[in-house]
Amino acid sequence: ENMVKPANAHLEVTENGYEIIPETVGTELDKEKVKATVKDAIAKGASKVNLEEAGCYTSPEVVSTDENLVKQRDQGNAFLNVTVTIDFADRQEIVDKEVMKDWLVVNEEGNIDLSHEKAKAYVQELKYEYDTFGTSRPFTTADGQNITVSGGDYGWVIAPNDTTTKILDAIKSGQSQTITPEYTYTAYRREKDEIGDTYVEISLSKQHMWFFKDGQLLVSTDVVTGNHNKGWDTH
């Protein structure tokens, strides 16, 4: 009743990488082998038998020296030893073994591979964090007012399929490296402050324009942004 079944050697991601966890022999007996061994001992007049020597304990099917297991360990570590830094100008995301370990899968050929689906799910998380197309932004006007500017058609959109492929290709190259995402839409600046300190500000209500370069006001002038009589109103 208290017999322990054998456990196969298997792979686990540890702080040292992809490691083979050795098999456990256990104490489970093969009942048919025990019966045959005892029967044979009785027939030979033996007073005792060694069940271990007779091979009566069930054995694990996969041991730590298994060639396929060793191959898979080495394949997994080839991936886990790579670090890919994804550059977002003033911010970075790191794809290392802590991120990558959940992407490891066994393919149809029995080799360790990277799951495109799981990698794409990671890229989708990046999109939630870094896509900015059409989002509103805080802005301080030339006269010091803190306002919110509507997003319009300005901003960044990560291309999920191309970015996923780019990350996986970088990992499979075996070389740690820094990459930039692939984008469907791009803006002037990738920093968190996408407007920066060089821009033109126009106030429709005041009919005035300011031009800042590197944070310095270079031009301040009145403008006419439309013509009501011709139906060219600006809003």
How would you describe each model-predicted region?
Residues 1-235:
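Surface-exposed, secretory/extracytoplasmic low-complexity segments enriched in Ser/Thr/Asn/Gly/Pro
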